[in-house]
Amino acid sequence: MTTDTIVAQATAPGRGGVGIIRVSGPQAAQVALEVTGKTLKARYAEYLPFKAQDGSELDQGIALFFPNPHSFTGEDVLELQGHGGPVVMDMLIKRILTISGVRPARPGEFSERAFLNDKMDLTQAEAIADLIDASSEEAAKSALQSLQGQFSKRIHTLVESLIHLRIYVEAAIDFPEEEIDFLADGKVAGDLQAIIDNLDAVRKEANQGAIMREGMKVVIAGRPNAGKSSLLNALSGKDSAIVTDIAGTTRDVLREHIHIDGMPLHIIDTAGLRDASDEVEKIGIERAWDEIRQADRVLFMVDGTTTDATDPKEIWPDFIDRLPEQIGITVIRNKADQTQESLGICHVSQPTLIRLSAKTGQGVDALRNHLKECMGFSGNSEGGFMARRRHLDALQRAAEHLLIGQEQLEGYMAGEILAEELRIAQQHLNEITGEFSSDDLLGRIFSSFCIGK
């Protein structure tokens, strides 16, 4: 339970029609009394003067008091809504700080107190910052879903399933004299597989949510002179890369951060992949592969004037064999202005094929729409939940321990090891919602918030 009271401006710094000062803690009611000159009625908006220590008026506006526990932080909360000039806001905060027991809030401290007082879990607290920082309607929808608890519900469902399975497994361990072999009756294996399948579905949606938040990493790869740099320029809308007819012009990695309808993408142009004798080009090609291995999606560039093939395994089997399985691939047949091919997307099973001309820009809009779809943009959906890198890491660790437990069950009927792996997996899932989190982790998360949130 906190004993100090915090204050900060809740609205963005700068000039505005309205500025809001937020106060939270046991001294909030005293602050209201000293600044407004009266005891405020709970959850009732009153238009009042805001007074300095000598009784002179600093400003006038709306005062709202929310007694605990029915407030954002779960503590007594006061909001003063005055004129939004920076001087006025600063004068009000300085006035409030003259009252004993009040100090300036740290970044994210209001949300941190809401979390510590069980007003929201950790994913919901993080969703507040994500909603504020959303760069597209789709990202805002996803952040709102997390704020409303959609992500948390999925995690809680997994945790509940793990708890029930742990009870069953540990009962089998504790009561070995029972005639029924609980570990071999099929229920444990079936329930464990159902949890793994459910976790895989959550991981897939969380990965989509992380892309929505952090942006999708798209690597343009292919042989020299396929038009990779021209495509980077076409997508970024500027001449980021040097374009010539000389194969191997690009020898290093080029990056551009762009937005498509507000959705962030990190576009990376790489050196043409081939067996190079030049030492500098070799380094560039190895860097290209480093980027490819970390990509969310690879745009496989093909010079349409050199082949009629559309299957990347036929065009370049060595490249496909070396490409990690989890990375999505889109085949780009470039130079359609010369081959006179029909432009746009052609879904020939998988991967997706797009015909375009990077030089003229024809067909590039089809690629932009395709990339939006890959990021989860639908235009009319409610949006999935938002996720962060730490969520993905925790989900992955949980999945790894479940798979270890499954191997021990299937191979050795090792109930004790399975029970321990289930416990560790549950612990990793609890880290996501904050039911098990170190103080250091909480400090890092909330320090990234705005002051006043």
Curated annotation (Swiss-Prot):
Keyword match Cytoplasm: yes
GO MF terms, alphabetically ordered: GTP binding; GTPase activity; metal ion binding
CDD domains assigned to the protein according to its UniProt record, in alphabetical order: trmE, TrmE_N
GO cellular component terms, semicolon-separated: cytosol
Domain TrmE-type G: 215-376
Pfam families: MMR_HSR1, MnmE_helical, TrmE_N
UniProt-listed GO biological process terms: tRNA methylation; tRNA wobble uridine modification
Cofactor note: Binds 1 potassium ion per subunit.
Residues annotated to bind GTP: 225-230, 244-250, 269-272, 334-337
Protein's job: Exhibits a very high intrinsic GTPase hydrolysis rate. Involved in the addition of a carboxymethylaminomethyl (cmnm) group at the wobble position (U34) of certain tRNAs, forming tRNA-cmnm(5)s(2)U34.
PANTHER family, alphabetized: TRNA MODIFICATION GTPASE GTPBP3 (PTHR42714), TRNA MODIFICATION GTPASE GTPBP3, MITOCHONDRIAL (PTHR42714:SF2)
Protein name: tRNA modification GTPase MnmE
Native source species: Vibrio vulnificus (strain CMCP6)
